[in-house]
Amino acid sequence: MRGRGLLFALVFVAYPLGAQNPDGLSVGRQMLAEDNPGELWVQRGERLFFEKRGPKGASLERCDLGLGPGKVEGAFARLPRYFPDTDKVQDLESRLLTCMVSLQGFKREDIVRERFGTLDRDSDMEALVSFIGSKSNGLKMDMPLAHPKEREAYKSGEYLFHRRSGPLDFSCATCHAEEGKRIRLQDLPNMTDAKQMQMVVATGWPAYRGTQASVRTMQHRLYDCNWQMRLPDLGFASEMSVALTSYLYGRGKGGVVQLPGVRR
C-alpha cells in the first residue's frame, strides 16, 4: 500500500519514545487514533468488495454475511453465526473465504497463503475485514446463540480459552484472566471482566498495528497468540479459531463497535 514505508518510519520513531515513558506511548496511540491509518484499509476493502474479481469475474455483492446477500451494515456485530449453506458457525474471515471461493472462483489455498499482509504485499482479506467491520460502527456486539451449533462453538471456545497445553503449559487465561499483567509495553486485558472483554471485541480487531505498519484481524491475533505459546500453527478459518472467536465475541456482547482499532 502506498505510503506504508512512511507510516512505518513514523511509528518507528514514535514508539521508542513511548518505551521510555508509558505516558508518551499513550500519546502516540492517541495521535494514531485521531488520524487512523487503518482507514486506508477500509477504503481499499470497500473497493475490493464491489470490484468484479477472480476467475468468475464477480463482486462480493451476493455474499451473505448473515443479514442477506450484499448487506454489510451491522453484519460484523452479529458474527460469528451459523450458516445453513455450509452447516457451520463462521466468523467474518471464514465466511469471506467461503464467498471468495464459491462466488469469485478464487482457490482456497491462494487466499489462505496471502491471508496476512507483509511490508511488501497487502492482504485483500485484511482490507475486506476492515471495511465490513467499520460498517458496524456505533452498533452493539450481538453474536447470536440460538442455534445449537452456535452454543456448541461458544462452549468449545470457552474450553480452549482455559485449556493449558504446549511446552510452556500456557492457556489464553494464563495471560488474560487477571488484572495488571503486561508483556513488555503491552498491557494485557483481563478477559474475565465483562467491560474489558467488550472493549477487546468491539474496538480491538481489526486494528492498525503501529509496530507492523499494517491492519491485523482477530484471526491474526489468535494465530500470533498461539505462536507465542509455542503451540502448532492455528489454521486460518479453522474450527478451533472460529470456536475461540465465538467465545470471545459471545462474552463481548453489548460492546459498541468502533473499528478499525489502533494497537501498538
Model feature map: region roles:
Residues 5, 146-147, 260-264:
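Short alpha-helical "patches" and their helix-cap loops
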Residues 1-7:
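Bacterial N-terminal signal peptides that target proteins for export
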Residues 128-132, 144-145:
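Hydrophobic, well-structured mid-protein blocks that either form specific transmembrane helices
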Residues 126, 130, 151, 155-159, ...:
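Internal, well-ordered alpha-helical scaffold/interface segments
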Residues 20-40, 51-65, 69-127, 137-138, ...:
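Electron-transfer interface patches adjacent to heme c in soluble/periplasmic c-type cytochromes
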Residues 14-16:
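N-terminal signal peptide c-region/cleavage motif recognized by signal peptidases
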Residues 30-47, 138-158:
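Short, charged low-complexity linear segments at domain edges
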